[in-house]
Amino acid sequence: MSRIIMLIPLDKDIGLTSIGLSIIYFFYQKKIKKKSVQSILYFSCTQNSSNSTSHVINKYFSKIVHTVDYIDFSKVLFNSPEYSFLLNKVIDEHYNNKFLRELILIEGIKNNYCINSEEMNYDISQNLNAEVIFIANLENSSPEYIKNKEKKINFFLKQKKYKNILGVIFNQINSPFLENKYDFIKKLIVLKKIKNETKTIVPKKILKNNFFSIIACIPWNRNIVTTRVIDLFNFLNIQHTNLVQKKNHIIEEIIIFDTHHLNLLNKHSLNTLVIVSFSRVDVFLNVLNCNVNRSKVKCIILTGILKLKKNIASLYKFLIKRSISIFFTEKNTIEILSQLQNFNFDISVKDITYIKKLQRYISNFFCHSSFMFFKKKYNINVIYPPKEFCYNLKLLSQKKNKRIKLPESYEIRILKSVAICSDSNIAQCVLLGDPKKIYSIANDNGINLKKNIEIIDPISVRQEYLARFLEIRKGKNINEFSAKKQLEDNTVLATLILESNHVDGLVSGSINTTSDTIRPALQIIKTNPQSLLVSSIFFMLLPNQVLIYGDCAININPTAEELAVIAIQSADSAKMFGIEPRIAMLSYSTGCSGFGCQVEKVKEATSIIKNRRSDLIIDGPIQYDAAVSNKVAKLKAPSSPISGSANVFIFPDLNSGNIAYKAVQRSSRIVSIGPMLQGLRKPVNDLSRGASVEDIIYTIALTSIQSE
């Protein structure tokens, strides 16, 4: 299985492309075991620049790195449908590649690219359960500046509560360009004056921080900052007529030829680029021909040229004879200068020699211990992100491909869900109702119900199940007349169809009460022989993890024995869906801090579970805050086996459970899937009457996975 790392920018000018390329180089050289074709997957969350990392990879490293180029979060709003669509695409890529690649490297969203970059970076990384590397810069290495930088990063990390943090890379240390006080021309002047190759190296010990690890401190290096002729003109994307051998020459100075053209006479640079407006061509020719040491001028940009004209042919001949490269564009001088302000001095995408030099320089600051796969230390606390959970729901249900009965077939949400499930092969949905009426409702609401979706007309099949219903309800004072009356309820009929093995599961409740769904299931399907009771759980899809709440829908005031059964059922359900259960038996007190019949009930239930299922990680009685917070757990329950990381919460009664799940769901505005019923011989699941189409789809998937 691949390792997934996400690079998250904390500042604007951090050399993200340089860091990404260098991490790829480091992993391929030092940590990738199988040097197979495209053993690394890379993608950026934005596609804003022709100088992007993916552009360099596709040009020079496509044999070892596979890229994904169609994902761009910079143009969508956080939590919008477009955002959810892109996030699902990212998760698809992750799952499609996690067994094919050794490393998945994701480049996060820069702060200046998107207004919601912080929220998106957090959400993407947590839903992928990625290891996170933050990238920051340091304008200077003074103790005061470093201290302030550490405070800012600490504050940021406390706010966002990232999981799986590998550490921080400080890049561009002491770069003269971080303050953004220079325009492009002045930057060239600064580079010309700086002679030393690197700035002072900042030792890691100076940046020692208890809140985050320091992976590398990379000083700015003058020797890898270039402004070659070819890079400038590829960046400007303008035409040329005489590139000659000077394409790799370094440009040290830019001169704008205007009414103050005498500045051309006074310069002593040997590598000069001159920008000339076509309207001043004649004057420029005279100056160049008569007064200037021509070796100074390496190339010329002619601006404002709409098309090649005969009257500049002499200019071309003159310049070509003197080995001066000529470039021309329709843009005016101001537009060209404005475009040059965005030129990236730190990466040259056209020169593989330069790129490899940069990769070696930066990767020298990395070490093996900095990239230790820290999850191995914390296997017990692996978080299951909600998007990954939902993706797995669909994946598992697609593999099972079960027949799921939906009796509320005239409800628009049900029909929309069935259409999506059919298109996505999540399940074979079977509707119960008048086919003509169902198709009429679907057509009126723009729902495309494919012809392969099975629709059973209840009028035509009720008589078939009458005898079986009377047999099941024998001894309950039900005669044929009352049985026929009950079978007019489509939920009762659908439950009989399930009991007869004609379908694999049943989903109902979008327009009916919970009791309308559960009562027929208890009367007809009945409990599993291994179960004493039927209980329910909700899957609570929090922003960065999935929690299970039980029982929030069925058992009003369970005994200690019943509470133990509910907890064991919930733990087994968690495992069914890939969640390693850590169970909190909730109460209003933790450990021995409180007394009362409710506390004693929870204590007894916990003891029963430990005796029956020693394989389960469980603690109780325990308060909710001690169950979810490591800090609180250290104070209230220092020896707790769940250590503030519970993911299965068993409430002592229906009153507390139902209130809690609705409070969390509504206050946090999260998706909750359920209630999923446990303990029945066949899967029957209830929908909330306020269920969305998405909720219904996930409940159908849950039901399919529960089916044997």
From Swiss-Prot:
In the N-terminal section; belongs to the CobB/CobQ family. In the C-terminal section; belongs to the phosphate acetyltransferase and butyryltransferase family. Coiled coil: none annotated. It catalyses: acetyl-CoA + phosphate = acetyl phosphate + CoA. The keyword Acyltransferase applies. One of its GO terms (molecular function) is phosphate acetyltransferase activity. This is Phosphate acetyltransferase. Gene3D superfamilies: 3.40.50.10950, HprK N-terminal domain-like, Isocitrate/Isopropylmalate dehydrogenase-like. GO terms for biological process: acetyl-CoA biosynthetic process. It comes from Buchnera aphidicola subsp. Acyrthosiphon pisum (strain APS). InterPro entries: DRTGG (IPR010766), P-Actrans_bac (IPR016475), P_AcTrfase (IPR004614), P_AcTrfase_dom1 (IPR042113), P_AcTrfase_dom2 (IPR042112), Phos_Acetyltrans/Butyryltrans (IPR050500), PTA_PTB (IPR002505), Ser_kin/Pase_Hpr-like_N_sf (IPR028979). Residues 388-708 are annotated as: Phosphate acetyltransferase. It is found in: Cytoplasm. Pfam families: AAA_26 (PF13500), DRTGG (PF07085), PTA_PTB (PF01515). It comes from the Bacteria. Keywords: Acyltransferase, Cytoplasm, Transferase. Disulfide bonds: none annotated. Its EC number is 2.3.1.8. It is an enzyme of class 2 (transferase). The gene is pta. Homohexamer. Involved in acetate metabolism.
